[in-house]
Structure formats: structure tokens, C-alpha cells
């Protein structure tokens, strides 16, 4: 294989955890998405959103990541939804609203330090679907809270994992 192409096919993810932990992560993802799906069926609201699958990968497969912390997940989705609603009012064209929305969501999440990459899909989702307004805000924020809740319970079960990450405490006891 040519040297220049080798970097594209080399795995850069560090080996971590046991097979049991990986199986628990997969089960957690299935339960998390299942809970959101059950909420959708029960409430007749479109809670089962594609970006939540990507959130589940982070929440259950990489819970130590800053991108998987509750403030990032819930805050990122909240900011993304508010930006999306504003952009859809200002730009009637779906592709323009999606493009401007994604750009603004990236910038605002970065500025606020609540980056959650799956939330970047919300402007595209809203620009290409019939989910709008209060329904969009409710299902996105409600679904993200549900996923974080399931992840919190999931990581409490053995083999346990500290989630959410705790802020380090300094020697004098101050955070």
C-alpha cells in the first residue's frame, strides 16, 4: 500500500477496556435508544432521531470523553435547536438554513464549551423534515435528557464507570 494512503486505513483508536465492558456499552446503547423509541411510541412524538444514535456511541462507548458529558449532550442539543429554529425563520431555503445552521451551531457550541458533534445534525434534520417549532425543541431536548439519564444509570451498574466525570477537587477542598 502506498505510504500516503496508509494513514487513511490505520486505526488510531487506542485499545481500551475488556470485551465485557464493550458488550455492556453495546447493551447500554440498545437500551438507551430503546427507551427513546418507547417514549416516541408512548407519546406519539418523533423522539427517535438519527443524531441520537451517534450520541449513544459517545454516551455508552466513550463516556469519559468531554463530548459525552451531560452539559455537552443536553446543552449542545439545546443550543443547536434554538439556533435551528432561528435560522429556519430567517432562511426559507432548506439547504441554506441547514448550512448556516450547522456553521452557527459549531461556532456557538465551541464558544460555550459544550460541543456535542451529533447536535450539529439538528439543523439538517429540521431543514429536511416536518418536525418544527416547539415539537423540535421538546423532542430534541427531552430525548437528550432521557439518553443522559439512561447512561447515568447504565454506568452505575457493574462494571461501574464514573459518569458523569467529576470535577477534580483541589487540596483545600475547593473545586
Predicted regions and their residues:
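Alpha-helical structural signal
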Residues: 53-54, 105, 121
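Alpha-helical transmembrane segments and their membrane-interface boundaries
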Residues: 1-78, 82-86, 90-99, 129-175
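Active-site beta-strand/loop microenvironment that shapes enzyme catalytic pockets
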Residues: 82-83, 111, 123-124
